[in-house]
From Swiss-Prot:
The active site is at D169 (charge relay system), H201 (charge relay system), S357 (charge relay system). Residues 131-421 form the Peptidase S8 domain. This is Subtilisin-like protease 2. It comes from Arthroderma benhamiae (strain ATCC MYA-4681 / CBS 112371). The keyword Signal applies. InterPro entries: PCSK9_ProteinaseK-like, Peptidase_S8/S53_dom, Peptidase_S8/S53_dom_sf, Peptidase_S8_Asp-AS, Peptidase_S8_His-AS, Peptidase_S8_Ser-AS, Peptidase_S8_subtilisin-like, Peptidase_S8_subtilisin-rel. The lineage of its organism: Eukaryota, Fungi, Dikarya, Ascomycota, Pezizomycotina. Its EC number is 3.4.21.-.
Length: 421
């Protein structure tokens, strides 16, 4: 069994077409967490088989640690650490010596063993203020003035009410005035760290989804699911957080009233693509960023997950920013350059940023908005409705991507409520 060494990155903001700085698709050997792995089990195992397998792992790991060869590696390993169960997908993380990893790779119950990896936050770039993104979402793709503060954003007054948007990110400043008490601290996977947003990325993303001024779905609830902190994370924490989100949505009976946003990207990593796919089969919608590499998104995770809604970035005059990924797996295009939203540093703080990190929450907000006004019983129905509303053939330099820009459908409704922001 081949051991794969790929990673996942929280998407950086970029400086637009003036100075795009894409992250490398493949992380270097130094990013691997020594002795730590993600193990995916084969489908169809019974609870008893999984329980027996874990007992076997503990026994083999202990025996190997007791041997001189295992002890000579110099890597302290702790065995199975966390368990992940998403629909019928069973995975676990663990700290294992090399001999135990070899034994795991040969075990008939094991589908794959992937090294865990550090995931890094990149620096953000603050840019001049702009207010075009929301107006674009209700204009049927009509180019809008970049710096105008009088662009109409028209929407149904339900505006995401009764819907929950889960943001797997750096946390959310739930006390920011933009959230009006609709921000919820859900899960913090980072040990010994407060559930706050020290980097701004998660708060920014949440503001585009549900901020009273900057949000697409202005009455939706936003749930903070923190998997990143001081610039670094691992799949151990990302999978834990995604698992928690899926469980929380399921246990709260919110499947048709919840959406997950993932403004993260990295090289193709099958365990996480599998997790997103299993969430879809469980009845949960996930919206993901296409990535900021200026390349085909087919080599990125989670953009390549077949049933995620993958979002590329478009500029105000309907061109693709050079940083935005593209390709047949990009389902839809949404505003992603010079977008203003909430930020860290205070309950009124704002920042203007660029990247597919901004494009993805526009569509996650659109999903929340549509869930509040229409009966969309499944992720398939959600995806079909979002794509049915899109405006075709507007994006210049879309490469071989489906050429569809996001639209909220307001001009086809019987009533239109003009709003200003």
């Amino acid at each position: 069994m081949q051991l794969l060494n790929f990673g996942l990155l929280l998407l950086p903001f970029v400086a637009g077409d003036l100075a795009p700085q894409p992250e490398p698709l493949l992380a270097g050997p130094s990013d691997v967490v020594p002795g730590q792995y993600i193990v995916t089990l084969k489908e169809g195992l019974t609870s008893a088989q999984i329980r027996d397998h874990k007992k076997w792992v503990s026994s083999v790991h202990r025996a190997n640690l007791d041997s001189f060869a295992a002890g000579a590696s110099g890597v302290e390993t702790e065995g199975i650490m966390k368990h992940f169960h998403i629909h019928d997908l069973n995975m676990y993380s663990g700290g294992f010596d090399e001999k135990t990893v070899e034994d795991l790779s040969r075990n008939p119950y094991v589908k794959s063993v992937h090294p865990d990896q550090h995931v890094y936050l990149a620096k953000t770039v603050t840019q001049r203020q702009a207010r075009w993104g929301l107006g674009y979402m209700s204009s049927k793709g009509k180019p809008v003035p970049l710096h105008s503060t009088l662009v109409d954003y028209s929407y149904d007054d339900k505006a995401g009410e009764g819907v929950w948007a889960y943001v797997l990110d750096t946390g959310i400043n739930v006390n920011h005035v933009e959230f009006e008490g609709r921000g919820i601290l859900g899960h913090n996977a980072i040990p010994n760290k407060p559930h706050t947003d020290e980097f701004g990325h998660g708060t920014y993303v949440a503001g585009i989804i549900a901020g009273k001024t900057y949000g697409v779905a202005k009455k939706a609830n936003v749930v903070s699911a923190k998997a990143f902190d001081t610039g670094s994370s691992t799949y151990n924490y990302i999978l834990e957080t995604y698992d928690w989100i899926v469980r929380n949505i399921t246990d709260s009976n919110r499947k048709n009233k919840a959406v997950i946003n993932l403004s993260i990207s990295g090289a193709k990593y099958q365990p996480f693509d599998d997790a997103v796919e299993k969430a879809f089969k469980a009845g949960i919608t996930t919206v993901v960023a296409a990535g900021n590499d200026g390349k085909d998104a087919k080599n990125n995770t989670p953009a390549s997950s077949p049933n995620a809604i993958t979002v590329g970035a478009v500029r105000w005059e309907n061109t693709r920013p050079s940083f935005s990924n593209y390709g047949k797996l990009v389902d839809i295009w949404a505003p992603g350059e010079l977008i203003k939203s909430c930020w860290k540093g205070g309950n009124n703080a704002t920042s203007t940023q660029s990247g597919t990190s901004a494009a993805s929450p526009h569509v996650a907000g659109l999903v929340a908005y549509l869930m509040s006004i229409e009966n969309l019983p499944s992720p398939s129905a959600v995806t079909a409705r979002v794509l049915n509303l899109t405006i075709p053939n507007l994006v210049k330099d879309a490469k071989d991507s489906p050429n569809r820009v996001a639209y909220n459908g307001i001009q086809e409704r019987k009533f239109t409520l003009p709003k200003y922001y």
